[in-house]
């Protein structure tokens, strides 16, 4: 079947770049697709073209997607366009699904029993908690365990050497090399493997057993890979092995949208594609069908300053006025109040004109508004306001690890000790993190006296005669601060702990950041007492745990990561301030290491991905502090003033 006949039989509105991509079937092909360029349409249409125009049996094609949801979506779209019978003959899998098949086939061919897959999250968490406690000599919080899991995934997906793993101890705030080694030893002893091991074992099996590799190469001579920029080093290595016989590899991605470095995403594979696949063709899809021209132009100009990328330019297909604006507020709390007012307007529009428009034709109830932010905790003060005002919102991928982060727990434990001075166990957890200057052996004696005599730890310190005059003075000073905490507003209590009780110094000694403490301060500013803040935190944790998703709500809260691949009519980017987004600046680009440059450019990509979610309007919040990304993106900033009652003026 010729192209013209295929077009007539399966009509699709494709531009010239898309048509070229669809018709590029043989040999290695890298398709670089800018945001909103219709890459899924091209992938699905290309599969149909391979089958109907080129006569390739669908059983010979393997399509690799990043998530199970993407697998299901692509299969459904293919079935809708080309029929379910043909769709059922195609193979759509995640890389883990492919590896599970490889391991199963290995066992069947060799007669050996592969390790069983460990998919019980509780068993994994309990095991890692025991290993962490042994290595760190302290109990792991849920946040600590989440960090351990992320680092283990990173190590296995990045194919790190033992030397490189030990180097991670310097920056990981834990003995990750020890934890990693003990965890893997336990897995082997139990004859188990985790999801990341699936890839490690599958890769090893393909390398060591040529017959197994040939079987898969013959089974799938054509490979299509989606979201290649998010694929890890070991995943790319597996794909390269599978494609090495025919080199019929079609890889779709965009290094400008690679934002999963913490999960070991390996965009370098896209940059070195031509080197690794001689004779490769690199195609571009540069037309953005999603966003207004002003958004496209601003975002493209911004990302052009990255250096670790292919040369390409995003172009708009939509006309539109300049709709990229800065909202400059004095404080982060002003930002939250502004967004609460926006949410209230969305709710009113939805309630009054469901499916309709306002009198002036501008307020469509189906209009989607998304607030995008870097981390989940950035949204907590906004969620708090929305809940207080009973304003509806929809949240993507709620995350509650904030409440179990070690710095948050430290502050809460200090508050707890202020309220319960007889709590010797809590005293032992915090005494060395505030300016008591008590030695460990003395702290243990004080705790014992407190428990046996049923008195406060501060009275126990007085009765214990082993403290120097200087230390005793420090203890009395700490006791005074503890008493003051009971009389202060929530935010004042947080500031006292951080700046006057020595906790900031402890953070600096440990190389820890105080960013989460700032969120506590903002939440505390809405409470008349420290006890009120503690109660509100419990309520918020319960809300986030139990909240059901209202899919009809058009006001959405999401991290930028969770918004990837999605689009919204209006987007508000929160906290675009140096130190938050970007988390770190590249102070001296000429002297920056390769790793520093890579990390900074990923920060830029994260901002770029957030900006390109917007279809019609993009607003960027700044809070009076340096905001380099916003300055780069915008040429005509608009300042918003927040009224006394918290209702913003129109930007």
Place the predicted regions along the sequence by residue.
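Short glycine-/polar-rich loops that comprise or flank the Walker A/P-loop
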Residues: 27, 56-60, 87-88, 245-248, ...
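Conserved helicase core region in the C-terminal RecA-like lobe
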Residues: 93-101, 224-227, 252, 375, ...
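Helicase P-loop NTPase motor core
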Residues: 35-43, 278-281, 286-392, 419-420
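Conserved helicase NTPase motor core
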Residues: 3-7, 12-23, 27-38, 43, ...
